[in-house]
Amino acid sequence: MSNQGSRRNGPVKLRLTVLCAKNLVKKDFFRLPDSFAKVVVDGSGQCHSTDTVKNTLDPKWNQHYDLYIGKSDSITISVWNHKKIHKKQGAGFLGCVRLLSNAINRLKDTGYQRLDLCKLGPNDNDTVRGQIVVSLQSRDRIGSGGQVVDCSRLFDNDLPDGWEERRTASGRIQYLNHITRTTQWERPTRPASEYSSPGRPLSCFVDENTPITGTNGASCGQTSDPRISERRVRSQRHRNYMSRTHLHTPPDLPEGYEQRTTQQGQVYFLHTQTGVSTWHDPRVPRDLGNVNCEELGPLPPGWEIRNTATGRVYFVDHNNRTTQFTDPRLSANLHLVLNRQNQQLKEQQPPQVVSLCQLPDEVECLTVPRYKRDLVHKLKSLRQELSQQQPQAGHCRIEVSREEIFEESYRQVMKMRPKDLWKRLMIKFRGEEGLDYGGVAREWLYLLSHDMLNPYYGLFQYSRDDIYTLQINPDSAVNPEHLSYFHFVGRIMGMAVFHGHYIDGGFTLPFYKQLLGKPITLDDMESVDPDLHNSLVWILENDITGVLDHTFCVEHNAYGELIQHELKPSGKSIPVTEDTKKEYVRLYVNWRFLRGIEAQFLALQKGFNEVIPQHLLKAFDEKELELIICGLGKIDVSDWKSNTRLKHCTTDSNIVKWFWKAVESFDEERRARLLQFVTGSSRVPLQGFKALQGAAGPRLFTIHQIDASTNNLPKAHTCFNRIDIPPYETYEKLYEKLLTAIEETCGFAVE
């Protein structure tokens, strides 16, 4: 009690925020610690513990505590492994920081600070490693909202320019030199560029702050020197540059300039005082065109480099659907480029400008190309982004039986972590010896999508009786595990896109629009329910006074039972009038697409985005997303013919002529079955047959005439998109054998 009273004589209230820790020591070979932090105001009885973050050496807590600190009080922040604290006294200790009174005063109101973890005492034998990030705020500086902080960037300035810290599978830290593309165990002390070119000037951003240790408090804290603030700004710019997933905000345009975009998506810059325009970004000196692109790092997500017809490089922003000549990395990292070249930026004259309306025809080739809805290029950009996420080692192995493909796939996929689904897909059908070089995975997705999208299971239903497009079944809750199954469906759709395959089935266009996070409008109703669309349009275009007797209540049929739904509270008693009909239509459309399916759709979207991050799809619209997920449903026979390779036969061979004669006689369903028999998928890539994929990249559809008995059936090699056909004597025999093969056979084997 005396201690409590002494604190009231002059204690101050401080808010301690424990943000995160990094590089904690790994003491178990097979397991990572379940880490939590403990905060103690020594001798005061104040004690707090953060939540436990499981299985990580880099826990993130972002939790705050209000502490009453006296003049002589100290704070001890310790990190523990929850898995071991119950075994014996002191077990599970991972490191601590002790802040004495002078250190507390210097740390106060200086923002987040990185503190090195230390041992409990000098004679302690525990191995300790890592840092913890905390902040101390005075009571009068505590705001109502918390600040969002990216923990990873608080550690970036530990390393000189050009270096990156990575961890091996066993937890050991290694350092990657992005300039020389080498690794080492020792912590680097010089910029990466010095290891390859000793004569090169130092980067102006090798500017490490003095580490703050918590053992005695002597070096903890920072002063209010303006130079410190400037160092912080420069360090933040450096961290932004080193980040591989973030392009920080470009500097402001020079006074008098505005950035604008033409109707065709071309970015230009207008000098408002003179009224003239330029394609060139005035923030970037024109003599920087020869900068080595490797020094600037990768393009931001969603950007792509292309060339004009004359070979000039330009840049496409798929996120905003614009084009420009200026490298987006230059305008954002201009200060870095200039310092690296050891140049001082002198006053620049306004860049040479040309009025858009006066641009002569003969220099039209210098105009920034218009943004095109070029799906092939956008898909290529998406594939590049996804390939960077795929681990270089390991496989996603799934073994199922054909009879229980839905349930067995569900159990195996749902117990995997999302990042495991990024590994190379290896599918095996139980009892079959086929090796998966792509063909087995295609057939697995083909068969699985048939089952999981089948309205018989109650997850989906046909949107209309006359068009077999699917939508989520609002009554899917008859299966108590339906949300988990929708999560599974989303993962399978994401896996198909990630690994370059397709789902055999189609949803309504509004479904893809919702998957992209776009709002639904009345126009979207036309393709799903044209009768309802026409009725709602008529309501909007005509005076309904005295004509309609509607209320804000609608009916729908659920398994034969007529159920009423109020579009707004007490809607059953609220009539629809000329003044409220727009609200009625808006609520009706929203209910029609979301009635009882909010939870189902969110579960599906969650599964899809676990494999395909949402931001990678910004460049696509709903029609393009449908092609990415489902491929082309209609088979173009002429495209098929022109992109077919012949082996041991020619275009004049009877086998080839009869094969195409049979294909042309097939209906769409049989053509799809034939394509599925040979390639493993009934869908055509959106680029057409020229983009069919094999075991090691693009591989055309191949007809191979083999020397075998004409009593044998044709044989398919799905991993190579090849069909082996014996030299049948007549067209009728080829037709019969081909039909039998695609209708009656299944299974894989190894020759």
From Swiss-Prot:
Domain WW, first and last residues per copy: 157-190, 251-284, 297-330
Pathway linked to the protein: Protein modification; protein ubiquitination
Chain residue ranges for the region called Disordered: 214-236
EC number(s) reported in the record: 2.3.2.26
Compartments, as annotated in UniProt: Nucleus; Cytoplasm; Cell membrane; Membrane raft
Stretches with biased composition (Polar residues): 214-226
Gene Ontology BP terms: negative regulation of BMP signaling pathway; proteasome-mediated ubiquitin-dependent protein catabolic process; protein ubiquitination
GO cellular component, one term: plasma membrane
One annotated GO molecular function: ubiquitin protein ligase activity
Keyword terms, alphabetized: Cell membrane, Cytoplasm, Membrane, Nucleus, Repeat, Transferase, Ubl conjugation pathway
Function: E3 ubiquitin-protein ligase which accepts ubiquitin from an E2 ubiquitin-conjugating enzyme in the form of a thioester and then directly transfers the ubiquitin to targeted substrates.
UniProt-recorded name of the protein: E3 ubiquitin-protein ligase SMURF2
Gene for this chain: smurf2
